[in-house]
Structures are given as structure tokens and as C-alpha cells.
Amino acid sequence: MSIDFDSGALQTQQEDEEYDKEDYAREQELQQLLTDLPHDMLDDSLSSSPEPSYSDCSGHEISEKIPQWEHGANWGNDDLPNHQKPYKNGFTENQYCMGFVGKQDEHLRNQAGRDKMSNGWDVLHANEDDPMFNGKYRYSKDHAYNSESNGQAFHGGDHYDAPGHCSSSELYHLPDDFQPYTNCQQVEHFPDSKKEHFQGFAVPEETSKISTEPFQVKYNPYQIKVARMDEMNQDPERRDGNFDDLQREFLDTGENSTGNMQFVQLQVLYKARGRQLEEQNNKLEESERQIRYLNHQLAIVKDQKDGLTISLQESQSLLQNSREMEIQLKGQLTALEKTVESLTTNEEQLRKELNISKVAMESFQQQLLDLRRSESIQRAREQHETVVSMLKKKHEEQVLALQQKLDDVNAMLNEEKELCSRLETRLKLSERKEAESKLEKTDIINRLSKSLEESQKQCANLLQSGSIQEATQLRLQLQQVQSSKIINDGMNKALQEEVRELQEQITMYESAARLGAFVNSGEEQQLSDSYVELGIKNFNWQKSRLGRIVANNGVKNDLSSEEIILELKTELERCLNSNKTKRKQIVQLQAELKGHLLKNEELKKSMEIAERTARDSQIQAENLANKVNNSPFYSSSSDRFREEIQKLQSEKQILQQENEKHLLFIKEFTVNEEKLKASNQELCNEMRGMIQDFDQDKKEAIERCERTYEQHNEDIKAHLLNELYEKFESEKELLSQGYEEKITLLQAQMNEIHREMAAVQECYIAVCKEKDALEENMREHFKKELQKSEEEVTAKAIQDVEMEWAQKLNQALQDAKTKSLQSFETQTIQTDESSLAKSDLNSDCIDELKVKLQNAIQEKEKAVHQAQLELEERHHEETSKQVEVALTRAYGRWLQELTSLPEYKARLKLEQEKWEKTNERNVERQVSDALYAAEIKWKMRSDKVDFTVRQKEFEEKIASMKRELELKAEESQALLKAEIATSRAQWNKEKHDEIQRLREDNEKDYRVFLDEHRNKLTDTLSTAKVEFEKQKNELIAQKDREMAERLDESLKQWALDESRRMRALENEILSEVEQCMYEIHDQLLDKSIVKDRLPSMKSNLDVTFLEKLKACLQKSVKGILYKVLANARQDWKKKYDTESNQETGIRGGELEGSDDRKTAKMWYLDKDLGKTEKQPCCEHWVQQLEKSKKECYEIRSKLEKACRHLQQLVKEQKLKAEKYRKNHILTEELKKQNSELQKKLELTVAPSPACLEPVEGGSNGCMMCNGNALEEIRAQYIKAVDKIKNDMLRYIHESKGRAAELLKSEVLRERQETARKMRKYYLTCLQQLLKDDGNNEGAEKKIINAASKLATMAKVLETPVSQKYQSKSLNSDLPQNENFLSETTQDQRSLQKPAHSHQNNNPLNQNIDQQTIEELIKRHVREKSDGNKVTDAEGASAINENSSFPTLRKSLVDNGNSQFVPSAPFQKLKTFSCIDSSTEGVLVTHQNKQSALQSGTLYPNSEHPKKKPGLQRFDLQETPVRDENGSNDWSCISSKSLFQPHSAKGSLTQLKMGPQNADVEEHSSAVASCSLAEENHNTFSSGARNQHFFAQVAKRKDENSGRKYSNKIQEPSATGIHPESKLFSDVGQGNKLPSRKLLLDFTLSPQQDSGFDSPFPNLNNFN
């Protein structure tokens, strides 16, 4: 009857087309081979298989695995497992096979819907009711895996965790009468619950994303150890039962009958013989079965041996290659050490120089402060300031005096203009008055002539009439005429006096014109007329001209100044942006500090979780004690259990004490961490202080530069003012000379004109003489006529009077005597009056004629003078108009600009007010004159009214005379006008030509002057610019040199301090490692747990770091101890197998004795092993060592960060120094230019006094040019100063940036070099430590050897540590691995939990077959050829579903090998890990617990090919900086994590060993395979084409993931796990030996540096 293997359970998931058919065929062949085996072979294999069973029927396996699991994670708080305890019979009893075998399947079913940890421990384990399951781990469906050696079956779920120890898959059904081979020992029967347990189960639907198809199952034979134990327990009972039957038959027979007695005896003997025969037959059959089984095992072992020989040859070749590589690396290391030494010396020199520069700077600053404080400098400054203030005051006073002079001159000019205007108005008024007087005189003459005629007519009429009344009327008229004559005479006198005054003024005017005052005043009038018309002064004109010249010549300068201002604004914005960036950097640093604080809190939380796990382990220990008390074997072996319990309790107390010590260490570590934070904060404060000091120095330097530039500006300004003033004075003199020459020419021309005028005057005098002669003739003739008329009138009057007297006498004589007397009196009176009237009339007529002649002469003279004046005025007006036109054309722009000036408007208002006042005065005067004239006219008219009658006659006479005079005057005036017109036309032509010539000459001269002035200004400005640029360059160079020297000194000092501090830290760490190694060595030699020492010396290291260092070292030593024990147990079991086989063939009857001896030997062995295994401290110390390493890495990362920051600051300082040097050069150049300008000033100041006394007319013209040039120079100087300021600011900003970059690069370089050296030394030491020379020596020797190797490792670690090339690929591609982070964070917990499982029952060593190895090699070759053609979807599906290594990938992640989750071709490479080696599990896994998180990010989960289709070469072009928040371990890969080709070796070698040496063989194979892997991993990996691996390392690094991993890496598991449990749990997943072709492919690949200096340098070329 054959066992029914469920074919459905053996099928694998075939959801993709990429399933390997060859692997499936091999699976089918293996299935057929197992089903065809006979029952006896299966029985033998069940009892004799050394492999641990994965089936649920193996209650013994469960009972032994679970306590080991618990012991791994909580070695300090849990009891030792039961299978390790020595019993009296020498066997290890199974305490749980009867108790919970039936419940296991039910429990596994209940685990599906619960929360799962990464290692399968149920979160809700505290709520479990059954006490049988409180002490073991629970596993969900995810942990049930197929145990076939090809490893094709896997789960496609996303929440895959590490495999458990007990399979929850559907199991095969054992027959009811099945009994294993017992070797004549009693076999324990399975209880009825076994049948229920053997039933397969379907996975519940509650588990998300998990396939519900049946699981694949491999036949797992029953373990020999269980069989032996059951035989020991059950054989005595079976024997006792048989003898009781015989005794009963014997006693029941009749005692009387002898025949019956004999028959019965014979029957008994026969039965006894039959039983003996049966027993012999059974033994024979059993021996045959055993022989068959051993033959079968021998064949398997031979095949394994062939494979091992091949692998040994390959490993030897790889070892040789690795040794060559090691020699090369040593050479490189020595070279690097030399470079490091040279760099350290350079750093020391730089620091010394930096210190010197700092001291010099401080001394200079102190000297500057002292100089500032010193009284002499203050006095000099005060004197300088006083001198400057005095000069400014003098300058201002001079300016004010000049302005006052100008104002006075302008006022004088205005007054003269007013006088001229008044004189002109007076002349006009006088002319008008003269015209009016002429008109009045003509009217009077006309009237007089008329009155004469009328009087003559009246006289004639009177003479004719001769009446007395007429005579009286005539007398009255005569009286009136006489009175009017008197009035006219007075008016004539007044008019003559006014005419004299005007003549005197005209003579004065003519004399002034002859002397040249008129020309000068006319020249002044040229300016004054235009100014009067515009209402402005010469000062404003000068300013306006200055502004115009600035506007014309300084356009480019203004534009350049605006551009400079814009540049200044942009530079100011850049400085503000740098400050903002620095502030942002400070904020980032604060955020990082907060992140580190959060990390510390998370570490504290992890400590709390560890304490919780310790409590859980205590609870589990109590549960174990309860289980032991309640177990069915307690009654039989209570004494042993009590002893074991006492031992466990004692160990528990010791572990509790150690735990308390560790807590103290943790507290000390926290204190050290706080100290480190404080030191970091102090460093940050120092950095801030340095930055503030630098900013303050920068500000002081800028202020100093500003002061120097201001002083320089003032000096240059004064110098330029003096130079320009001198130039302008000289130019003014030249212009004044030119103008004077022109004035002389004009005077000469005026003299000629005066000569002509003199000729004209002579002609006029001749005419006047002729006129006088004519007037005299006319007067004589008129006098004669008057005399004649008078004589005639007198004669007529006498006759008339005589007649009247005669008549009156006659009448009077006749009338009366009285009347005669009266009449006589009246007549006498009348005669007197008439005579008098006649005489008066004659004299009056003569006088009037004289007056008229004089008036005519005067009028002619006045007309001549007036013509001359008009000609002169017209000449002056024309010249002034021409000059004004030229001036208006030349200064048209200035006039346009001037109207907008406020001063112009104010002056206009003033001039308008003055003009209005003068007009008002003139109007008042004119009104008063008009009133006076009107009064006179009125009086004259009133007088004339009385004499109208008399004057008619005189008027007729006068009219006749006037007509004659007018005719003569008109003739003379016509002659004069004709002569004057001819002379005026000639003179106008000549003057017009001369004015045009003068105008052209003036324009030419003005243009030449402007061109020369502009050229001079441009030359001076260009020279000033050149000198200013030179000084600026010199100042900048000087400042750069000073800054460079200071930076060099500061860098040297800083490098020295940092190197000393790093050396001190390294020395302290190494001393602590040595001391810990000595203590571990003493503990191992004494075989007793010694209390941990507190740190004796006061070290700067953290207490937690020291504690972790101790823990790591102890853990490594414990791993070596376990290896040694495993080797010893394996050797002993081999010997015992051989002896037992010999004894079974020879002795049949002495079986019980041999069994007793065997049990005694086993008991003694277990007792020795129990003694040796009571020291589980080493593993805990290894864990603590790893924690300390992590702390060390964290501290190093912080130090590197600080170094980076310092390096950046140094770079900034260098940049600032360069900028300062440039500024210094610039300032020196400016100083030189300043000195040159001062020399020029001194040279030019000497002739300046002579130039300071110019002519007033010239000074007005040159002040404008002077002011214009000053404004231009000032604008250019302000531009230059602003540009220098901008350059300084920009230089400071750039220097800061350069110093920061330099600091970063230097710190990064140092950090990378030291990290690389550290990792190299550490890996080499681990490699040497993990090497096993194959000497099967005693346990103590091996322990001593391991301790000595650890001590040498600690000595080697004294060299500086760094990671130069590892950071090159850690800073990229992290956003792609978020899905993988969720897995690796769970797996990271499982990394710590399975840390202490199976030492004897190793599930790694099962189900490895040669067929599966060959299949895997073929698959690797095929997938390597097709690896680059994988698409995104295919790559993802291949990794997610059809890959044959999902559980192995998880196990590799859990074992710190999460670096290896690469894309398709590399999946085969990752399986060659030294999973069998317990030493690797102890040391290397703990070394890479921290790197597992980081390496988990190197290659994310199976979704990786979706993002990167195919494998690509990744060439790093720049050195990346390690992320501060990432993992602290930069180790790319552990020595075990890449290739572990010897994992199958251990499992296959165990198949041919006896059933009793299974546990020992597990450890021996693990040690052998690990040593081979450690010796060959560098060489083997050197040929691997894994460029893509390191490319993905560079691309998958992320801050968040690194932070998560770094936080979760230190969380201990919820329950205790042996560090080897995860290592041993991966063999069933299908480890594969590399074929020779595969190795050749690896070695042929080119080597390319990926940036990681790892033991696998050629993996970067994987394509």
C-alpha cells in the first residue's frame, strides 16, 4: 500500500506564461519517485531521515522549534529549550507532541484573519485562550510554504512574510497501522487528534490577496529523534505486556498433570522460540530496511560529494582571485593612507596658517581700534574736519560775496538802466514840451500878428476917427497886450532854462560817449536790455548756461549713472537673496535637528518595546514552567525538570541582572547623546558667531571703504574745482581780452561815426549861422519898419491929441472953469498914458520879434541836436538789436529753460514790480506836468481873452512874419533832412555790414570755445575714470589677498582641530573595543557570566554606543561558540553512528546494554552541551555591538554633516577673501589716483590767485562752465563710488558662496575617505575572523581563537574610518520603493526576532536536490540571456508571480540582504547566500541589520522592473552626499548577503549520516559552508555583472525610507528569536549552487567602479 500524495497539493501556481517547464518536470519526477517508494523504505526514511520535517505530523519538531524560536529573541529571559536538557536515559523527551499536535492545525487556521507581524507572530497572541500556544509563534497562511527543493511554489500575495517552521499546507495521510523503525525500542503511538491534524485545510477567504489554491507538499520523513524517544518510552511497555500473557497461560494450566505441564512447557518454549524467531526476522527485516536506506543515502551523498568537489575547485579558484584582489586592495589602501597622511599634514599647515592669520587679523583690528581711540587720530580728524569746515565756510562766503557783488553790479546796471530810461522819458517829454511850446509860440505869434494887424487897423480907424473913446479902448488893449507880453516873456524864460538843462545833459551825454562810457554802457546795455526784457540777472543766466552745458555734454554720464544705480539695485537684491538662502539653510538645519530629536524619541520607544518583549519573554517562561508542570512526563522526570527549572531560574536572575546593567548602559548612552547634541549646538553657535563676526568685519570694511571713498570724493571734488576754476579763469581772461579787443574796434568805429557827426554838426552850425544872419537881417528890417510905423503912429497920435486938446480947451473954456480943470487933468493923464502905451507897444513888438528869432534859432539847434541824438540812438539800438539777436540765438535754449526756473519767476516779479513803480512815477510826473501846462494854458487863455481884440492886429502881423519864418524853416529843414537821410543811409549800410561781420565772428568764436571746453572736459573725465579704475583694482586685489590669507589660516586651524577630534574619538572607540574583547575572553575562559563593568575611564563616547559595541562583540563570540559546539556534536555523532552500527551487527542480545551505553553517552554529551550552552550572553553582546555600531555611524554622520557645514563656511571665507583682495587692490588704485590728483591740485593751486581776480564781465561767463564741469565730475564720482560699493557687496556674497562650497567638498571628501577605510578594515577583519581552517579542535581552543581574532579586528579598527565611494549611489531613486518599504519594515522586525533559533534542528538543510540545482543554473543562464528584453509588465509579473524565489527574497531581506531584490537576471544570483552558516547569522547579519534597511531601499520589491525595464548601466559623474536622515550604515552588502553557494552542501551531506547525528551535522555543514562562503565571496562577486545593482542602489535611496528604516532597525522583536533562525529558514526555498558557466560569466564581466568600495567591486558591470 502506497501513501496517497495529493497531486493537487503538489501543483504550483501557473498564472503566467513564464513558468519553467523543466522545473515542473523535475517536480513531477520527484513526486513519482516519492510515491513509488515502498512502505518499509518510507518507514525507514521516516525514522532515519536526518532532515527536520515540515509536516504537521511532526509534533516533536514543533515542540523543539518553538522553544528555540523563543530562546532566540529572548535569550536573556527565557528558559532553555527542552531538547537541550539531559535526561536520565540520555534521550530528549518530547513534551508537547501529545499535547498540542492535534491543535496545531486548528490554530493555524485561526491565524488567517489576524494581524500579522513580519515574522508571523500574532499581534493578538496575548488574547489566546489555549496555554499550549502561548509559548510559540503563530503563523498565518503567508508562512506556510512549499518545502520542495526547487522552490517553484510561492504565494502571490503582497503580504508575504518569512516562512515559519511548521507547514500549514495540506498533508499526506499516514496509514492507521503505520509504525516507524524503532530499532527494538518502544514507539509512541499518535493520539487520535493526529488524524484530525493530518487533514488538509483551505485558506480562509479573509486573507486579502492570497491565493486559495491547494498548497504544494513534499514528503517529509519522520525524524529519527522522535522515533528513538518513542522507542525508549514504549518498548518496555510492549515487553511487559507479552510476558504477562505467557505467565497467565502458564499459571492457568493444571498443576497435577505432568504431561500437561510438559506440554505447556514445550508450548511455552515453542512460543518463546517462535517469538525469538519473529524477533530475529523482524530484526533482519529492519536491518535490511536500514541497509537499503543507507545505500540510498550513500548514493545521494556520493552525488553531493561530486557536487561539493566541483564547488570546492571553483571556490579555490575564487579564493585565489580574492587573494589577488586583496593584495591589490592592500596596495591601494597603503597609497590612500599615504595620501591621507599628506592631507592631514596639509590640513595641519593650513590650520596653523589660519591661526596665524586670525591672530594677525585680531591684532590689526585691535590696532585699528586703538588708532580710532587714540587722541592723535581724533585730533587729526578734528583738525581735518575743522579745516574742511573752514574751507567750506570760506568757499560759501566767497560764493556769497561773489553773488552779492553780482547782485550789486546787477542792481547798479538796473539803476543805470532806470536812469537811462528816465532820461529817455525826460527827453521825450522835453521834446513833446518843445513841440507844444513851438505850437503855442506859433499860435501866439499868429495871434499877435493878427492882433497887430487888428490894432493897426484900429489905430488907423482911430486915427481916422480920432475919438477919445477909441483912444481909451486902445489904451486898454495896450495894457492887456503888455500884460500878456510879460506872461509870455516869463514862459519863454522858463522854457529857455529847461532847454539849457537839456543842452547841458546832451553835452554830458556826448562827452561820455566820446570818453567811451557810452560804448561800455552800451555794451552793458546789450546785456541789460535783454535781461530787462527777460527780467533775469546774469547769475541766473550763468546757472542756466551751466545747466545747458550739463544737459548738452552730460547726457551719457547721466545715463551711465542710471545704469550704475540699476546695477547697484541688482547687487543689493543678490545680497538679500544670499541672506535669504542662509536663513533657509539655518531653518533646514533646525529641521534636521528636530528630525534627530524625533529619532531619539523613536529609539526610546524602541527601548520601551524591548522592555515589553522582555516582559513577554518572562510570561512565556512562566507559561513554559506551567506547561512543564502540566506535561504527562512530569511525574516520571520531575526531578530532572526541577533541576532544569532551578537552572533556568538562576540563568533568568543572571539575565535580569544583565538586563539592568544594559539599562544603565542605555542611560549612559542617552547622556552621551545629549552631550553630543550639546556639542553640536555649541558648534552651530560657533558657526553662527563666526558668520556674525565675518558680517561685522564686512560691515566695518565697507564703512571704512565708504569713508575713504567719501574723503577721496571730497578731495577730488576740491581738486577738480580748483583746476576747473583756474581753467575757467584763464578762459575768462582770454574771452575778456577778446571782448576788449572787439570793444576797442567798436570804439574806433564809434569815433569815426563821431567824426562824421562832427562834420555834420559843422555843416549844421554853418546853416545855423546863415539862419542867424538871415534872422538878424530880418530883425533889422523889422525894427526899421517898426520905427517907421511908430514914428507915424506917434505923429498921428500927437496930431490927434493936439486936435482933441484944442477941442477940449475950447469946450472947457466954454463950459466952465472947473470942468476945464478936470478935463485938463484927465486930458493930461490920457496924453501921458497914450504916450506911454505907444512906447510900450513899440518895445513889445521889438521884443517879440527878437524872441521869435531866438526861438527859431533854438528850434533849429534843437532839431539838429535831436537828429544827432536820434541817429546815435538808432545806431545803438541797431547794434544792441544785432547783439541781442546773436545772444538770443546762442542762448535760445537757455532762455527756454530759464522760464521754468523759480528764481527767474521771482526776479521777473521783482522787475515787473519795479517797472510798475517806475511807470507809476512817470505817469504821475507826466500828469503833474500836463496839469501844470494846462494851468499855464488856462491862464494864458484867460489873459488872451482880454487882449483878443488888440492881439488880432498883432496876430495878423505875426502870422505874416511867421509864414515867412516857416517858409525859411521848411527850406532849411528840407535841406537838413536830405543831408541827414543821405548820411544816415550810408551809415546804416556800413553798420549793417559790420554787424554781420561781428555776428559771424562771434558765432565762430563761441563754437570754438564750446568745442575746446568739451574736449577738455572729456579728457579730464577720461583720465579721472582711468585713475579711479586703477585705484579700485588695487584696493580689490589687496582685500582679496588679505581675505585669502585669513581663510587659509582659518582652514588650516579648522582641519587640525577636526583631525585631532576624529583621532581622539577613534582612539576611544578602539580602546573600548579592546577592553570589551578582553572581558569577553575572560568570561569565556572562566565559563561563567561575569558582571559587566561600567566604563572605568571617563570617555567622551556615548554609553549606549559602548553597550551596543559590547553586545555585538559578545554576539559574534557566541556565534563562534555555537559553531564550535556544533562541530563537536557532529564529530561525536559520527563516532557514535559507527559504533552503534557495529554493535547492532555483532550483538543482538546485548541491545539493552548498548542502548544504556548510548543513552549514557548521549546524556553526558547533552550535559556538556548544556553546560556550554548556558552561556547565551555572546549573542546579546553581538546585538549590543551592532547597536553601538549604529550609534557610531549616527555620530559619524552628524560629524560629517558638521564637517560639511564647516567646509562650506571655509569655502565662503575663501571667496570672501578673494573679493576682499580685489577690493583692496581697487582701494590702492584709488589711493594712487587720489595722490596723483592731489599733486595736480597742488600744482594748479599756485597760479590760482592770479586767476581769481578776473574782469567782471568775464567772470559772469566762466562760472557757468565751472559749475557745469563740477556737476559732471560729481555725477561721475558718485557713479564710481556706487560701482565700487556694488562690487564689494557682490564680492562678499560670492566669497561666502565659494567658501560654503569648498567646505562642503572638503568635508565630504574627508568623510568618504575615512568611511571607506573603516568599512574596508572592518570587512577584512570579519573575513579573517570568520575563516575556519578546518581544524576540529576543542571548544575552548576555538573560543580562544575567535576571541583573538576579534581582538585583532579591534586593533585593526584603530585606523581612520570612512566610506568614500559608498555614498555615490545612495542619494537617488528612492521615491520608487515605497511599496517595498512596507515589506522591508515588517521584515526588519523579523530580522531581529529569528535571531536565536535552531542550533540542532536546522530547517535550512532540507529538500536540496541535485536536479533542482541544475534547473536553477539553467534558469539563471536562460534568464540572464533574456534579462535585458524584459518589458515593464513582464518584469513585474516575473518577479511578483512566476519567480521561483519569493520566499527566499523575503528571507534575504529579513537576513539583512535586502540589497538583493534586483530585476530578472539577478534573482538567481541572490540565492547563493551563506544561509547555513550560524556564524554569518551571528556576525554578518548583525553587521547588516542596519544596512538591511538601507539595502532594502537599494532594490525595492518586485515592482522594480516596472519602473526600470531591463538592466541599465549607471555611471555616476559626481560624488553624491550621503543623506543625513538615511541609514547610518553605508555598507553596501554584507559578506554573506551576495553569494552563498554552499547552502546546499550542508543539507546534502546530512542525508548520508546516521539518524543520531542530525543535529550535529547541521552545525558542521553550516560552519563549513559559511567558511567557504566567507573565503570566496569577494572573488565570486568580482565577476558578477551587477552594475545595475549599484545603479539601483543609487536610485532607490530616499530620506523618508531611510528615516523609517533607521527608526525601525533598532526595534526588537515582540518575542525572542535566535539570530540563526532566519538564516536556517531559507534553505527550503531553493538555494542553488552556481554552475561553472555562471561563474565564468561573472569573472569575464568588466570591472567598473560604481562608487562603492565594497568586497564586490565588479558587480557594477552587471548589464
Swiss-Prot record:
Residues 266-516, 571-664, 696-796, 843-886, 946-977, 1014-1047, 1182-1288 form a coiled coil. Keywords: Cilium biogenesis/degradation, Coiled coil, Cytoplasm, Cytoskeleton. Its main location: cytoplasm. GO terms for cellular component: centriole; centrosome; cytoplasm; deuterosome; pericentriolar material. Residues 44-57 have a biased composition (Low complexity). It comes from the Eukaryota. The keyword Coiled coil applies. One of its GO terms (biological process) is cell projection organization. Residues 1-60, 1383-1408, 1595-1628 are annotated as: Disordered. Residues 1603-1613 have a biased composition (Polar residues). It is found in: Cytoplasm, Cytoskeleton, Microtubule organizing center, Centrosome; Cytoplasm, Cytoskeleton, Microtubule organizing center, Centrosome, Centriole. The keyword Iron does not apply. Necessary for centrosome duplication; the function also seems to involve cep63, cdk5rap2 and wdr62 through a stepwise assembled complex at the centrosome that recruits cdk2 required for centriole duplication. Acts as a molecular scaffold facilitating the interaction of plk4 and cpap, 2 molecules involved in centriole formation. Also plays a key role in deuterosome-mediated centriole amplification in multiciliated that can generate more than 100 centrioles. Overexpression of cep152 can drive amplification of centrioles. Belongs to the CEP152 family. This is Centrosomal protein of 152 kDa. It comes from Xenopus laevis (African clawed frog). The lineage of its organism: Eukaryota, Metazoa, Chordata, Craniata, Vertebrata. The gene is cep152.
